[in-house]
Amino acid sequence: MPSKSLSNLSVTTGANESGSVPEGWERDFLPASDGTTTELVIRCVIPSLYLLIITVGLLGNIMLVKIFITNSAMRSVPNIFISNLAAGDLLLLLTCVPVDASRYFFDEWMFGKVGCKLIPVIQLTSVGVSVFTLTALSADRYRAIVNPMDMQTSGALLRTCVKAMGIWVVSVLLAVPEAVFSEVARISSLDNSSFTACIPYPQTDELHPKIHSVLIFLVYFLIPLAIISIYYYHIAKTLIKSAHNLPGEYNEHTKKQMETRKRLAKIVLVFVGCFIFCWFPNHILYMYRSFNYNEIDPSLGHMIVTLVARVLSFGNSCVNPFALYLLSESFRRHFNSQLCCGRKSYQERGTSYLLSSSAVRMTSLKSNAKNMVTNSVLLNGHSMKQEMAL
């Protein structure tokens, strides 16, 4: 639909009661359709960026899931959640990104009523899986660092799989209203030409989009991030307190342990930071449009902001494997070995501990005199004391 101008357009079917143009559909348009340099550049550059996002995202996330599935040492509670993130990203990359890219080649909605109902549900489900999984990961890091005695390994993987499935169920249920209200409508211009478009909430009043955008921002952004912030506040406080309280003669031993804990928490925090950076502009833009329901901004600046927000939000689906590659030595080694087609899969010696605090049973014996914590690790039935690192 990019070739349609924003001016002289109206909704002839599926219009809201006030007769105003529904929020949402105008974001798919370029400012003009006269073959200008701007239009031609956008038609080429944006789909190319989408193709890059799809290619890189599929490679990284498929490799991530494959590594966790094929290497038993990598199967842990945090890694199950990370695989859940990758699955949600793959869903978005395989469905929503190609559909969005097609809008720069075709003047009309090409995916029918079913596609109009399904695509918004898939996108919101993917966002829900991402932010709710990040919240669950933060809770896991909180328990591992602040309350290590509460970490139980008996049935932990099974319980985590159930939690991951629960995240999907909740995300799908929350996205169902998108399918209920989205409709394919025909947009008419004053020159008697018309085209079809997928419009969210076309038959509602001005209040509905405002409520919807605020709820989306709260449920899928602000509230989860507030919970994550609380978890990380307590994590930071515990790490600082532990560094001050541990006796000097054990500094070398505890330093490695502390670095491991901080590294694990850092990985999750980087994931959260990437999510905020990529999705915040999209949330703000959606609320801006919802609160300016009757106005259409045909300016080049608004169009550029819209395109940047879209590219950033879709780009979030390919950044997590890169972050993990940079921050985790174990994942980096396994990833490199997978890329080397002629080599055997890298078999890691010793204990792999990529976010695997729950893959082992840890019991803490606290000394009242020296406030020292000694971890006794049980792995495959054998007791061993060691410092585990990425």
From Swiss-Prot:
Its main location: membrane. It holds the Pfam family 7tm_1. GO terms for molecular function: bombesin receptor activity; neuropeptide receptor activity. Glycans are attached at N8, N16, N192. SMART domains: 7TM_GPCR_Srsx (SM01381). InterPro entries: Bombsn_rcpt-like, GPCR_Rhodpsn, GPCR_Rhodpsn_7TM, NeuroB_rcpt. Expressed in epididymis (at protein level). Residues 66-79, 140-156, 236-266, 328-390 are cytoplasmic. Residues 1-41, 100-117, 178-211, 288-299 are extracellular. A lipid is attached at C341 (S-palmitoyl cysteine). Induction: Up-regulated in response to infection with influenza A virus. Keywords: Cell membrane, Disulfide bond, G-protein coupled receptor, Glycoprotein, Lipoprotein, Membrane, Palmitate, Phosphoprotein, Receptor, Transducer, Transmembrane, Transmembrane helix. The modification Phosphoserine is found at S352. Belongs to the G-protein coupled receptor 1 family. This is Neuromedin-B receptor. It comes from Homo sapiens (Human).
